[in-house]
Amino acid sequence: MLPSFTRKPADHPIGYLVALSGLLMQLMSYGIDNSYSIFSEDMHNDPSLGFPSITAISLGNSVSLGLSPAFGVLAGFCVDRLPPRFMMALSTILLFTGLWISSTLAANIYVVTFTYCLFASIGTACMLSPGAAATSSWFNRYQGLAMGINFAGGGIGSAIIPPLAGKWVVAYGWRKAFQLMSIFCAIGVLATALSARRREPKRDDSSADDETREGNKSGNGSLVRRSNEPATVGGEGAANNGHNEGKEDVREMGRKNGSHTNTSKVPPNGRGVGTNQQNGNDGEGLDVTEQSQRNNTFASAIDVDMDTSMDADEPQVIRSLHTHKLTPWELFLSMFTLPFMGNFLCWFIYSWAFYSLIYAAVPYISSMGKPGTVYAGVPPIPTDVAATLFTFYGVFQVVGSVLVGWLASLVTAEFAYVFCATVGGIGCGLLALGRSYVAFALLLCIIGFCMAGMFAVMPTLIATHLYGPNLGFYFGAVFLAGVVGGFVAPPMQATIQLRNNGSYAFVCVVMSVSMTLSALVCYATLWRSKRSGIVLAARKTKLVEIM
């Protein structure tokens, strides 16, 4: 976008175009990445690859999805310093190149792993953090809904690309199917053109003069404070003079009467410190000792406020991750704070369920009726038919991403995350009992809805707890937690399945436990008030019964 289009206020409609760009990038990237397991059977029987084992093929899934968060740390560091458009263009080029190199040059499965899968991993990292950071910069009130739109792309891609890939691999083989999938990289070109980070609108001189005149009319010579500036204490003396003079003026005013100075802190009862005139001169009727103690207390409060506000620029003041661009060492130390650890652990545990499902869904469903397995007596479900179940999964991912994102705007992101993780954990457990196409479709709808909701709310949790000039780094660092789940889960699940006579029951149990445990971590570390927005609004509302 041109600079004139990016200088807009928060929650501007143009922000939805930026959210749409993130949706399109995820449609392309996750739609292609999630199709990899569909080709496992064809690769396993391909003599040009040397008939690789299922475990060796699953390593490609680990690299493409599991290593992506590791590269996401570097991408998150870069997105704070480079335009998101540059990162998205790089993502599109890498994915397109990987598809064509692997489909034309691969002589064994490891060439596929370290060309297509590795390029796809880096490409996914280059689009995820930039898209989320760019979208979050445009929204304040509707950030949950915007993030829901941004992260709905994975569901749309899963609904469109894997079913087509399933038909192509049956008709043409995995090599030709890879080349046909590269057509979807054109979507990344459009998404790159739409992405941009919001910048604050320029303030012309006339508007600044009008604001100054309004401030002078507000009383006591104090200027109206802008919403993005720190609160100041005192009147003209505090605003115009140096540190020491400002402090002495305000302290002297406090010791004399404590009636005309506004402070930046207000007690819970809603009354300011110096509100004697507004409340009938509460100081009357007190003896000299009580009046002296009251004035001293007021002066002490002013001292605290002045020390906090006037000395904000001194070197000894603690630097905040919300207001300062942190050094690498400070970024490392901030990773041990509760907000970061809570987000990191939520994603770390959730990734086991997510990547296990992406890897195991189609092989599990297509194993129905397969000889030599525990499902030999079940009516068979062919691979191309099993791949169509991703349509149900993808459609409900879209619904879940948008609906849960909207729900998070009404209540809290923590409530939405805990709810989706709990229901999704139950659905993953029931998946072990599925034996028919209809049962799998119903369960994948529920799981897709919940996983997409968690995926959409996660960036909102990160932006809420770790907002500031380092947000891009924190996006990448939190998503780094997915390395363990994404890299380890597919091979581990393949090994467990082979050692249990082809049974995927333990795979479903691992997914269920991961989802449920993720809900517990969010509840314990991130959900501070333990109340939803609707409950808080209901408690503040006083209903009067009219007889």
Curated annotation (Swiss-Prot):
Key word Lipid metabolism present: no
Known glycosylation sites: N501
Localization per record: Cell membrane
Ranges in the topological domain labelled Extracellular: 33-58, 107-108, 166-175, 366-386, 434-437, 492-505
Region ranges (Disordered): 198-293
Membrane-side (Cytoplasmic) residue stretches: 1-11, 80-85, 130-144, 197-344, 408-412, 459-470, 527-547
Topology with respect to the bilayer: Multi-pass membrane protein
GO cellular component terms attached to this protein's record: plasma membrane
Molecular-function annotations in GO: riboflavin transmembrane transporter activity
GO biological process, one term: riboflavin transport
Chain intervals with Basic and acidic residues compositional bias: 244-255
The keyword Glycoprotein appears for this protein: yes
Membrane spanning stretches: 12-32, 59-79, 86-106, 109-129, 145-165, 176-196, 345-365, 387-407, 413-433, 438-458, 471-491, 506-526
The entry's keywords: Cell membrane, Glycoprotein, Membrane, Transmembrane, Transmembrane helix, Transport
Family: Belongs to the major facilitator superfamily. RibJ family.
Biological role: Transporter involved in riboflavin (vitamin B2) uptake. Also transports FMN and FAD.
PANTHER family for this protein: RIBOFLAVIN TRANSPORTER RIBJ
Protein name from the UniProt record: Riboflavin transporter RibJ
Source species of the chain: Trypanosoma brucei brucei (strain 927/4 GUTat10.1)
Gene encoding the protein: RibJ
